[in-house]
């Protein structure tokens, strides 16, 4: 008992340390009571126990330890000094409490840790807990994980840093202990609540089963953003206030913290900085000084590649910067200057603040270089100086900038002012104090009086920006002497400025923005209560706790429920079934057979391994049918796939069986519950077949189906490992291709990138180029999701390979990853809340750095190295430092354990040798990058000493120290630096340099923090002393930092801290505080973003990578918003109404709800006029530039803001081109409905469109041009006239695009220029186009010259400005141009003038060189056109038009406009070839506008035709040379009543008058030649082909027999016919409209034409035959393949039946059929086989086998067999399913023939016989055997080989080839030398040219591949005049139809025949097999023509009767028609 009495007397603190456990127990109990009684947290009583708390928790006695833990918990909760014990106590808890068996001890230990977090020691707690994860005891690990999980759940990810936790997670999942793995799973679920993407990406490599389980749990989690349930002490007071205000219904301004966005892992943070200095070429510094610019360029290009890395490692860049600076400043080559500027930009962007030390050296040089005026240089310099500014402060470079302001060069002054303006935009009122503003204002005020307007404008902009930033109060003192006009200009500029930190500033705005917060908080609280309970359990304690409520601490805290448990229970019902993984054991083969036999037919299983492939194929078909019928639940997937794998399995040799197998695998995966076990069975076989040519696609489909069933990440990993375990390069490349597509379809978010990287690297090293290419393609796809950081992983690859990778990445630049369309990604994105996190799968790429292994370097930090670093000799110290740098460089990424290195490096920071200090600092920067976030554990022992170096007297040392501190802070964040007294101790030192740099650093860092440790208050007294420092710079820096300290600490705390100051000082400081309070920025940097995200205000580009159609996107946005508001912010709605319509810059989407519902263009009264006045008065920039600069774009934005809907403006000025397309689509939609708005904003719209002309994206440009065409059409309809301002700011930029290389763009631009003449006088257009002829672009010059010719042709010489003489002299200069197209265009334009004015042109063009004059004279001689004064005559006839052309105000309208437009189009097309300039007469033009305006009455031009010079019919007509066609201008406005006009024109095609027919064909051809107009012909194709075919018959029967008729005219008619048809058959959509009957007649006519001997006798006959040949090929290729094949079969049948038919005819039909057979493999899927087989059946019925054998030639039967064989080969047994249209299959020979053929083809491939058949066919005319042919050809080649007979041999070979065109001479050439082959080919070409040159028609008669020719010569066929060639009896109906046509031609009435039933009714009856001839289709079409003709005549007569004097009367009209009838009768009789 004596012992007991001794310790009982001891004081409490000694009892706690006593060796007896009872004494300690008593001590702990007493201590607990004492702790609970102390009310003051700062009581000195707490300090007594400061060193004992660790012992409380680490007591060896378990019972005593429990009491100690209770006491420790109360101590930590209530003691102010408790934070100092954090490290040792938490370490003790981890090691001595968490391993205890008692649950109570563990719970108390966890509570202690959480309490330390609450008192703001979270990072220390986290650090100790993370150390505990390395403990070997699983219990400790589990407890540490649980503590971290609870801390995260309660305090949130803002307090508990996720980055270090996420990195250790994978290791926990690998633990052997199940409890550790289970707790890790719960932890991963909790982390996922706070940061989804980061944890997903990190855990991709864990066991797939674990990953699957996790994913199932993740899906259950609520989608809403989580909120902390417990708060730090510093936040609790704020929370209490917020709750009170919310309950009182008041506004809570301070409640923004709740809504803070959860901090995401920043991609830039995860990037490893790239060290580029060592990678510079060794000879870089020599090359950069080289005399040759090419060498200097090489050096700069090498640097440019290196600085493209997004993050650069800090280092000594001084030499590099110096070299680049020298190039910028002194190099004479502007291209190199721009390149060097780009390099500087890259350095500044990559180094960020680390580049700041070099900014002062570079800025003056860049500013001086602005004297260079080249746009590309100026732009590069602007980008460089803007990037550099962001690395430094305006204060640092102010002296340099101000020095340049006095430069005499206006460009330098302008650019400097603009730079200042841009810099001011980044400033705030605190960073732009008066002391800094004053010198800038003084300099800028000089500039506003400068003589150069651009300098004045720039100065106004800079002053306006300053005014916007700091307010009028600060700037007005400097503007006292400025006059009112200039002051107004400054204010105007100020209003337009948009600041980087927000458009509006000041407290009012902040208050407005913060008002919705309480409502939103309340709403989300109400809506989210359930979720909160689920996740956090019953823990309201911390929410209501105030600092005063301390009693009973532990009990009040409550117990937190594990989120894994309760959250799971709360969200179980929400789980989606589609994400559940199917798990099944592997079954034995016996079980599989048993299960399969239950669901498959018995024969199916028996025949699986049959030796007969047909049986196996039949078995597969049954298998497939069975699988298709199975239900998901009853499908035994594993059993089925094992059956498929049964021998022969995946080694199946027959490709058809194999294809079926693979297809069945895909079906099973899609339809059944397909598990990974099943997948493992088949994947190996699929990978083996993926490279197979025939089965590869099926294998890919199966793999995709498996990926959907088993998830892509797992499938891809398996497939890749299997593919690269093989050696087959084809399989590898195809696997990579499949993966590329799969990633696009499934998304990227869950892929195990690490596994792929190794395989991709293997692929890149492959010898096979296909594998490498596929790997690079895959990398390109991955780049879409991962971003530029992906490249780092491949930096070690060979340069050539790296350049290919870079090129692939470049292609992907700017593209968005496509939205996933398959797999779970699709469901999860749709299920995600709209505002939740619009991130794309690409976010997964943020953790790419984590893919790289970190290396342990502690073993390399030896004691020898440490002693070297500390050696007395500085050289040895340097060696040691060099070694350390080398070690870190080599490792790149290192682990945090670096041994004794920190101590050694710390010593070197105080080194007397400053070079070594700098080197040490560089090493520390390297260390930060290499170690990453783990560097934070070295902040106290290494980071703080670096801050001491900031006090060094040398600038460069301080700069290096600052760069090091920044590098560390980037990795660690700021909390480590601000915690404790270290920073305040540094600030306390009275070193001006140290204070200056440190305060500047704090001013930079503090604004970015959302919260700071309370220890920041310790710095305040020293901050106040700095405010009074003797050094002005220190005082300034202190003033700059003051608002940011106040931002975090609040005004009250700051004011309270002045209590210890002297009264005088206190007053000064309080005044400064008041001033700082006004400028204090809002504390949280991102609450606005946090609000905008959940409320749907984020950019649509993020959430919708693939833009939806505009209508959908707009409407869906409008509809979706109200739902969003209901769900998320019901409390805000009332306020939204109150602020509706006001321009509040709120980040919520409330303002956007109404935006899209209103008009897109707002009519502002006199808005356009005001803008014109502003531009005229030089208040704004004149729209005149070479390339658009930022200031122009900003100006346009500002101007648009008042009259363009905000949402549309955002789309218009978005950086992504897809948004521009969207904007244009919306503008097109609103064009008609908002005419007034469009016209009022026209100047702005046109300016915006000029910006799009400078885009490189073709789709935007095409869309813009399409919009312009519609716009100018609308303007002309509205009779609008372009103003001078609109024209001058648009036309020059439009003319730039006329030189585009793409034809379609040039064509559109020309069309727009044409339409512009309707809204702007042509005479004013002329100078703009003339200016375009001065371009360096030859295409632009040529097009502009051609356009000038069109204008002159249309408007006469009056259009030439300033005078015709000057204009023509300018045009004539281009005759001597180097470019051929320009010369031709200039010559043609002059010839156009010559055609109008004759020889007068020679006076106007002045003196030309002899060469140019001779070219012009030659061209004029060659011109086929006689001088004509057409425009002059028109001017006489229409004086109004002349007036309008010369008038500025009045423009041509309606009728005259049409006429002018038509003429302009004609002139445009004819100007290139004046010899074809005979005008198409008015009678044959399609005047659709007039038709449309005639109120539905069809008005054809027939009466005019009758009235006009009828005697011309008997005179020779000058036929237009078939060159380039005139373009009809009226098809744009084509509507329903154009059909009658087209019918009328088509009827004229069949006219007996050649001239009429040619004119009609020309009209149709001009339509067919224009893609946008050709659709008008749709529905008229059969009608047109019938009319054309009739014209061919007419030529054959009448014209060719007429000896009086000039055969050249027939050739021209043929040219037009064939040209028309070739144009038609090049348009696939129209060609496919031709029906079978019409095609049959057409082919009949064309083949007969080729056999017409009379054609061959004509001079151009051969050319005609070649043209027909080409046309036949086009018809065969482009027509509907079913129709043409059917037509040919019927034609062959008819030709064989007809006794009069020539054998040659049948042979040509068969040749056509053989060509169709060759096309079948490509067209088989588009053919209706049932119809074709019906035609063959009918053919075989008409020609049975015996009858065919009786034919003279064997080729019909061989043709039929070849066709059937090919069909069998392509379709296989399925062909027998296509006999559905044959009524009696049993009677048909066809079925039996097909069965025989199928049986035969099973045993033989049949390919040999096919080839022999085709060869036989190609020798159809050869009577000799193959051997004889070979002998004959051998003889010819022998002659060619001899010197004497070479020419004779070539001639014979040419004749032979011509006669037997299908003969293959390749075998004879194959064995000869290359020289001999080319000699033979050249010789044949020469002979061909010689023979053709004698009688060649002018170039217009040939058909160029581009189809530039209008009409092509075409011989007709030998068709009988009766219209039928097959010898069949022709019925009377055909004669009647022909009679109707003749009557119509003569204007006679056809009404008497109306009661006759139409012939087409015969077609409805199932007549005999042959296809109905086209003649049968004439009746309905011609009836329509007749009716329209009669309507036209009647309406004309009616209208004529009511006409005034000067028009025809009814009687005269009738007389003329009668006269016409008589004349036509006379013509008809004379022709007979």
UniProtKB/Swiss-Prot annotation:
Biased composition (Polar residues): 1441-1450, 1972-1983
InterPro entries, A to Z: ARM-like (IPR011989), ARM-type_fold (IPR016024), CLASP_N_dom (IPR024395), HEAT_type_2 (IPR021133), TOG (IPR034085), XMAP215 (IPR045110), XMAP215_CLASP_TOG (IPR048491)
Modified residues (Phosphoserine): 816, 1469, 1861
Region of interest: TOG 5: 1193-1428
Keyword Acetylation tagged: yes
Region (TOG 2), start-end ranges: 268-502
Function: Binds to the plus end of microtubules and regulates microtubule dynamics and microtubule organization. Acts as a processive microtubule polymerase. Promotes cytoplasmic microtubule nucleation and elongation. Plays a major role in organizing spindle poles. In spindle formation protects kinetochore microtubules from depolymerization by KIF2C and has an essential role in centrosomal microtubule assembly independently of KIF2C activity. Contributes to centrosome integrity.
Domain note: The TOG (tumor overexpressed gene) domains are arranged in a N-terminal pentameric array with each domain composed of six (for the most part non-canonical) HEAT repeats forming a oblong paddle-like structure. Intra-HEAT loops are positioned along a face of the TOG domain and bind to a single alpha/beta-tubulin heterodimer. The TOG domains in the array seem to be structurally and functionally polarized. Differential functions may range from microtubule (MT) lattice binding and/or free tubulin heterodimer binding to potentiating stable incorporation of tubulin into the MT lattice.
Protein name: Cytoskeleton-associated protein 5
Phylogenetic placement of the source organism: Eukaryota, Metazoa, Chordata, Craniata, Vertebrata
């Amino acid at each position: 008992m004596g012992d007991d009495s001794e310790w009982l007397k001891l004081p409490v603190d000694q009892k706690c340390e006593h060796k007896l456990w009872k004494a300690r127990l008593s001590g702990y109990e007493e201590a607990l009571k004492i702790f609970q009684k102390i009310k003051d947290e700062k009581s000195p009583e707490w300090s007594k126990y400061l060193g004992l708390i660790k012992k409380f928790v680490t007591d060896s006695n378990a019972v005593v330890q429990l009491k100690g833990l209770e006491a420790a918990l109360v101590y930590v909760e209530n003691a102010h000094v408790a934070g100092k014990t954090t490290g040792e106590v938490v370490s003790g808890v981890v090691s001595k409490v968490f391993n205890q068996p008692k649950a109570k001890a563990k719970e108390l230990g966890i509570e202690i840790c959480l309490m330390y977090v609450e008192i703001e020691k979270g990072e220390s707690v986290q650090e100790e807990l993370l150390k505990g994860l390395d403990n070997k005891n699983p219990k400790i690990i589990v407890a540490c994980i649980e503590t971290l999980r609870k801390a995260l759940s309660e305090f949130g990810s803002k307090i508990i840093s996720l980055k270090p936790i996420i990195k250790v997670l994978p290791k926990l999942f690998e633990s052997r202990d199940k409890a550790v793995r289970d707790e890790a799973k719960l932890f991963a679920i909790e982390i996922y609540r706070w940061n989804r993407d980061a944890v997903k990406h990190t855990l991709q490599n864990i066991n797939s089963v674990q990953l699957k389980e996790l994913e199932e749990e993740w899906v259950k989690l609520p989608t809403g953003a989580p909120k902390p349930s417990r708060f730090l002490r510093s936040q609790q007071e704020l929370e209490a206030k917020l709750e009170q205000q919310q309950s009182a219904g008041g506004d809570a301004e301070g409640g923004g913290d709740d809504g803070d966005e959860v901090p995401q892992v920043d991609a830039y943070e995860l990037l490893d900085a790239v060290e580029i200095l060592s990678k510079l070429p060794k000879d870089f510094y020599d090359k950069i000084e080289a005399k040759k610019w090419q060498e200097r360029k090489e050096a700069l290009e090498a640097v440019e590649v290196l600085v493209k890395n997004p993050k650069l490692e800090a280092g000594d860049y001084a030499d590099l910067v110096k070299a680049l600076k020298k190039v910028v400043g002194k190099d004479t080559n502007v291209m190199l200057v721009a390149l060097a500027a780009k390099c500087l930009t890259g350095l500044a962007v990559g180094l960020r603040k680390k580049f700041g030390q070099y900014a002062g050296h570079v800025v003056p040089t860049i500013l001086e270089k602005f004297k260079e005026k080249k746009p590309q240089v100026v732009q590069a310099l602007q980008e460089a100086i803007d990037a550099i500014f962001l690395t430094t402060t305006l204060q640092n470079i102010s002296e340099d900038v101000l020095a340049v302001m006095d430069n005499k060069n206006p460009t330098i002054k302008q650019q400097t002012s603009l730079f200042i303006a841009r810099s001011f935009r980044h400033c705030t009122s605190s960073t732009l104090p008066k002391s800094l503003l004053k010198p800038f204002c003084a300099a800028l005020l000089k500039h506003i009086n400068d003589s150069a307007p651009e300098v004045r404008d720039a100065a106004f902009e800079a002053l306006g920006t300053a005014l916007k930033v700091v307010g009028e109060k600060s700037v007005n003192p400097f503007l006292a002497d400025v006059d009112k006009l200039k002051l107004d200009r400054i204010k105007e500029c100020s209003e337009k400025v948009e600041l980087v930190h927000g458009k509006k500033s000041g407290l009012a705005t902040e208050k407005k923005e913060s008002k919705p917060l309480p409502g939103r908080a309340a709403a989300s609280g109400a809506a989210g209560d359930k979720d909160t309970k689920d996740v956090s359990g019953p823990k309201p304690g911390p929410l209501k706790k105030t600092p005063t409520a301390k009693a009973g601490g532990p009990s009040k805290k409550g117990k937190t429920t594990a989120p894994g448990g309760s959250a799971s229970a709360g969200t179980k019902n929400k789980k989606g079934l589609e994400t559940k993984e199917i798990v099944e054991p592997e079954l034995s083969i016996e079980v599989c057979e048993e299960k399969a036999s239950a669901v498959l037919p018995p024969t199916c299983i028996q025949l699986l391994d049959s030796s007969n492939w047909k049986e196996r194929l039949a078995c597969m078909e049954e298998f497939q049918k069975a699988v298709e019928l199975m239900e998901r639940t009853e499908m035994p997937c594993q059993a089925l796939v094992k059956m498929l794998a049964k021998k022969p399995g995946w080694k199946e040799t027959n490709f058809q069986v194999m294809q079926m197998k693979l297809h069945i695998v895909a079906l099973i995966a899609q339809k059944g519950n397909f598990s990974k076990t099943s997948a493992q069975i088949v994947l190996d076989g699929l990978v083996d077949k993926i490279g197979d040519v025939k089965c590869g696609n099926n294998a890919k489909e199966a793999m995709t189906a498996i990926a959907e069933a088993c998830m892509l990440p797992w499938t891809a990993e398996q497939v890749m490992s299997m593919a690269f375990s093989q050696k087959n390069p084809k399989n590898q490349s195809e696997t990579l291709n499949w993966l590329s597509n799969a990633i696009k379809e499934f998304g990227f978010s869950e892929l195990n990138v690490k596994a792929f990287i190794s395989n991709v690297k293997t692929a890149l090293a492959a010898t096979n180029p296909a594998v490498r290419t596929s790997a690079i393609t895959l990398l390109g796809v991955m780049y879409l999701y991962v971003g530029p950081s992906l490249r780092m992983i491949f930096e070690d690859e060979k340069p050539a390979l790296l350049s290919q990778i870079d090129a692939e990445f470049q292609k992907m630049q700017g593209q968005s990853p496509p939205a996933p369309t398959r797999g779970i990604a699709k469901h999860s994105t749709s299920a995600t809340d709209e505002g939740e996190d619009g991130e794309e799968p690409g976010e997964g790429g943020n953790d790419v750095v984590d893919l790289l292994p970190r290396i342990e370097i502690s073993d390399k930090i030896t004691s020898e190295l440490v002693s070297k670093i500390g050696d007395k000799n500085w050289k040895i110290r340097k060696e040691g430092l060099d070694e350390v740098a080398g070690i870190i460089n080599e490792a790149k990424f290192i682990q945090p354990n670096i041994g004794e290195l920190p101590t050694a490096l710390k010593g070197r920071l105080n080194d007397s040798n400053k070079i070594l200090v700098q080197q040490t600092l560089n090493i520390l920067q390297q260390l930060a990058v290499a170690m990453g976030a783990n560097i934070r554990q070295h902040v106290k022992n290494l980071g703080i000493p670096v801050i001491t170096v900031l006090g060094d007297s040398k600038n460069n040392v301080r700069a290096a120290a600052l760069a090091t501190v920044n590098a560390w802070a980037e990795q660690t964040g700021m909390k480590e630096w601000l915690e404790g007294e270290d920073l305040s101790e540094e600030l306390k030192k009275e070193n001006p340099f140290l204070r200056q740099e440190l305060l500047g650093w704090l001013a930079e860092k503090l604004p970015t923090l959302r919260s700071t440790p309370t220890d920041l208050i310790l710095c305040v007294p020293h901050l106040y002393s700095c405010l009074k420092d003797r050094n002005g710079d220190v005082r300034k820096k202190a003033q700059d930092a003051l608002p940011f300290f106040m931002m975090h600490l609040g005004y009250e705390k700051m004011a309270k801290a002045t209590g210890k100051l002297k009264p005088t000082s206190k007053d000064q400081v309080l005044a400064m505080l008041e001033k700082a309070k006004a400028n204090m920025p809002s504390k949280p940097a991102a609450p606005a973003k946090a609000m905008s995200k959940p409320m749907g205000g984020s950019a649509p580009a993020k959430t919708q990578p693939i833009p939806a159609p505009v209508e959908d996107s707009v409407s869906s946005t409008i509809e979706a918003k109200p739902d969003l508001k209901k769900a998320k912010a019901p409390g805000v709605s009332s306020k939204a109404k109150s602020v509706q319509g006001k321009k509040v810059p709120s980040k919520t989407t409330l303002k956007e709800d109404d935006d899209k519902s209103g008009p897109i263009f707002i009519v502002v009264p006199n808005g356009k006029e005001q803008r014109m006045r502003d531009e005229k008065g030089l208040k704004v920039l004149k729209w005149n530039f070479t390339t658009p600069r930022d200031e122009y774009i900003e100006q346009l934005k500002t101007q648009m803001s008042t009259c363009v809907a905000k949402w549309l403006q955002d789309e218009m000025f978005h950086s992504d081109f897809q948004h521009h397309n969207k904007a244009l689509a919306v503008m097109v939609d609103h064009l008609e409905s908002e005419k007034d708005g469009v016209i009022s904003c026209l100047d702005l719209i046109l300016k915006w469109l000029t910006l799009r002309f400078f885009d490189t994206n073709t789709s935007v440009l095409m869309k813009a041009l399409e919009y312009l065409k519609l716009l100018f059409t609308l303007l002309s309809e509205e009779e609008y006239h372009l103003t001078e301002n609109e024209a001058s700011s648009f036309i020059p930029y439009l003319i730039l695009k006329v030189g585009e290389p793409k034809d379609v763009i040039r064509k559109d631009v020309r069309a727009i220029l044409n339409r512009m003449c309707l809204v702007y006088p042509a005479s004013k257009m002329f100078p703009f186009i003339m200016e375009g002829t001065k371009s360096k672009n030859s295409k632009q010059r040529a097009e502009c010259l051609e356009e000038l010719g069109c204008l002159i042709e249309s408007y006469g010489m009056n259009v030439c400005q300033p005078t015709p003489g000057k204009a023509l002299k300018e045009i004539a200069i281009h005759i001597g141009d180097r470019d051929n197209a320009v010369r031709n265009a200039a010559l043609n334009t002059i010839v156009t003038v010559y055609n109008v004015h004759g020889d007068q042109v020679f006076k106007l063009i002045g003196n030309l060189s002899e060469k140019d004059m001779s070219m012009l004279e030659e061209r004029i001689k060659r011109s086929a056109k006689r001088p004509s004064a057409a425009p002059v005559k028109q001017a006489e006839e229409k004086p109004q038009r002349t007036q309008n052309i010369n008038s500025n105000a009045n423009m041509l309208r309606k009728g005259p406009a049409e006429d002018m437009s038509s003429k302009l189009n004609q002139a445009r097309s004819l100007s290139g070839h004046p010899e074809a300039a005979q005008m198409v007469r008015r009678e044959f033009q399609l005047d659709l506008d007039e038709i449309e305006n005639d109120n539905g009455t069809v008005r054809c031009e027939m009466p005019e035709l009758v009235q006009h010079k009828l005697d011309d019919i008997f005179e020779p007509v000058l036929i237009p040379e078939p060159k380039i066609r005139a373009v009809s201008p009226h098809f744009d406005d084509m509507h329903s009543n154009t059909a009658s006009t087209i019918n009328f024109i088509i009827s004229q095609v069949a006219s007996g008058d050649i001239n009429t027919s040619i004119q009609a064909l020309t009209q149709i051809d001009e339509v067919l030649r224009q893609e946008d107009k050709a659709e008008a012909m749709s529905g008229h194709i059969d009608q047109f082909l019938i009319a054309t075919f009739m014209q061919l018959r007419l030529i054959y029967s009448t014209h060719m027999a007429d000896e009086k008729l000039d055969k050249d005219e027939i050739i021209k008619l043929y040219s037009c016919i064939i040209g028309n048809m070739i144009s038609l058959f090049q348009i696939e959509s129209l060609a496919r409209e031709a029906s079978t009957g019409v095609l049959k007649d057409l082919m009949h006519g064309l083949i007969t034409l080729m056999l017409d001997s009379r054609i061959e006798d004509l001079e151009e006959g051969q050319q005609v035959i070649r043209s027909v040949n080409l046309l036949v090929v086009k018809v065969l290729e482009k027509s509907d393949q079913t129709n043409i094949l059917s037509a040919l079969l019927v034609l062959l049948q008819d030709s064989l039946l007809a006794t009069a038919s020539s054998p040659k005819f049948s042979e040509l039909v068969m040749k056509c059929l053989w060509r169709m057979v060759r096309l079948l493999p490509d067209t088989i899927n588009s053919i209706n086989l049932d119809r074709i087989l019906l035609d063959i059946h009918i053919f075989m019925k008409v020609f049975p086998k015996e009858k065919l054998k009786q034919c003279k030639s064997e080729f019909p039967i061989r043709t039929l067999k070849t066709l059937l064989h090919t069909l069998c080969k392509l379709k296989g047994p399925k062909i027998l399913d296509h006999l559905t249209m044959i009524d009696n299959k049993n009677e048909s020979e066809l079925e039996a023939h097909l069965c025989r053929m199928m049986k035969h083809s099973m045993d033989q491939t049949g390919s040999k016989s096919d080839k022999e058949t085709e060869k036989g066919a190609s020798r159809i005319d050869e009577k000799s055997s193959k051997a004889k042919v070979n002998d004959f050809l051998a003889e010819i080649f022998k002659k060619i080989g001899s010197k004497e007979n070479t020419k004779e041999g070539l001639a014979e070979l040419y004749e032979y080839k011509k006669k037997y065109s299908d003969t293959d001479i390749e075998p004879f050439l194959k064995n000869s030398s290359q020289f001999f082959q080319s000699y033979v080919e050249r010789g044949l070409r020469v002979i061909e040219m010689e023979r053709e040159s004698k009688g060649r028609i002018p170039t217009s008669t040939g058909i160029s591949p581009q189809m530039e020719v209008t009409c092509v010569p075409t011989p007709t066929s030998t068709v009988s005049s009766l219209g039928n060639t097959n010898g069949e009896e022709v019925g009377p109906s055909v004669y009647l139809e022909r009679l109707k046509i003749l009557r119509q031609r003569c204007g006679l009435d056809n009404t008497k025949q109306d009661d006759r039933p139409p012939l087409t009714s015969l077609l409805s009856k199932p007549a005999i097999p042959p296809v109905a001839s086209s003649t049968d289709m004439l009746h309905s079409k011609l009836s329509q023509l007749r009716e329209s003709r009669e309507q036209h005549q009647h309406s004309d007569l009616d209208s004529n009767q009511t006409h005034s004097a000067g028009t025809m009367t009814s009687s005269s009209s009738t007389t003329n028609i009668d006269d016409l009838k008589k004349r036509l009768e006379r013509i008809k009789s004379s022709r007979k």
